[in-house]
């Protein structure tokens, strides 16, 4: 039986700690030691239990722990200092602004099948993802007007462990996107932003999630929604999972769907970078759009 209603019960953040939510939802903390220190200081045990996930940790702390932090002047000063650093980081001119002028809308788009940003958003397997994640972080530090585009995998990449007999086994932990530093992209009316792509004779819908990586937005497509068939839902099930057909379906969604997502969000980059061949269908979608826009035969 499907649930009629789902809801989450979380403690109420004291007003003086409300900035923790903003900090938790900007992945700048993942490469800033002072920001990391805020969460470790708030609850060392909670930080470790959450797998270094500040969003999950804030939802799991007891109310009295939050009240104690709110009454701790040393912690309050630490939080204020970090939030001031973040404010300056986000709004003061950096290298790109000093060399090339204002921000404008993103001029460069970075497409990748995986992004290794932090362990609490496990949608990467190794070097390719770490490279993509570091690319976004470096662009943020430099002030480069970049936007990232990828897929949001329900189970990510497999985890390895040894069973009692010493044999290597694999598991696919389920990702809870609502307890990760992610947010759904929404229209002005509050409805979810969605794109649609024709894949294998079926119209596949995907909603758009956003992760804020310092100054850089990263948009991730998620096909695991009730409107899709079970087969379509599985397209964003596992990173590099399934057979060759599944891989092609993922690449179609990334290339065609990623371009449509940016257009729907009002973004029109001048330069598109494809991290290896996984987003090769992006080139075909750009050609299709150019033919229609310029009425080419």
Q: What do the PLM-derived regions correspond to, one by one?
A:
Residues 1-297:
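Catalytic cores of carbohydrate-active enzymes across secretory and cytosolic contexts
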């Amino acid at each position: 039986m499907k649930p009629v209603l789902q809801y989450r019960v979380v403690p109420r953040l004291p007003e003086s700690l409300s900035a923790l939510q903003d900090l938790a939802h900007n992945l700048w903390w993942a490469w800033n030691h002072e920001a990391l220190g805020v969460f470790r200081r708030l609850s060392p045990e909670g930080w470790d239990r959450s797998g270094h996930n500040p969003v999950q940790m804030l939802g799991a702390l007891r109310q009295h722990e939050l009240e104690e932090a709110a009454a701790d002047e040393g912690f309050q000063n630490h939080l204020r200092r970090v939030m001031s650093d973040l404010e300056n980081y986000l709004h003061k001119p950096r290298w790109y602004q000093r060399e090339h002028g204002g921000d404008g809308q993103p001029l460069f788009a970075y497409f990748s099948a995986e992004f290794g940003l932090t362990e609490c958003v496990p949608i990467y397997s190794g070097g390719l993802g770490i490279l993509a994640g570091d690319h976004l972080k470096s662009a943020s530090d430099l002030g480069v007007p970049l936007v990232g585009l990828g897929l949001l995998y329900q189970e990510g990449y497999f985890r390895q462990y040894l069973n009692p007999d010493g044999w290597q086994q694999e598991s696919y932990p389920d990702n809870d996107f609502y307890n990760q530093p992610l947010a759904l992209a929404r229209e002005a009316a509050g409805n979810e932003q969605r794109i649609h792509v024709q894949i294998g004779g079926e119209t596949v819908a995907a909603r758009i999630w956003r992760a804020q990586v310092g100054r850089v937005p990263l948009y991730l497509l998620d096909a695991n929604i009730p409107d899709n068939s079970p087969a379509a839902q599985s397209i964003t099930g596992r990173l590099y999972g399934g057979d060759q057909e599944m891989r092609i379906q993922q690449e179609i969604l990334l290339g065609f769907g990623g371009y449509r997502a940016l257009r729907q969000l009002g973004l029109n980059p001048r330069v598109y970078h494809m991290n290896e061949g996984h987003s090769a269908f992006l080139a075909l979608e750009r050609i299709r759009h150019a033919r229609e826009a310029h009425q080419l035969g």
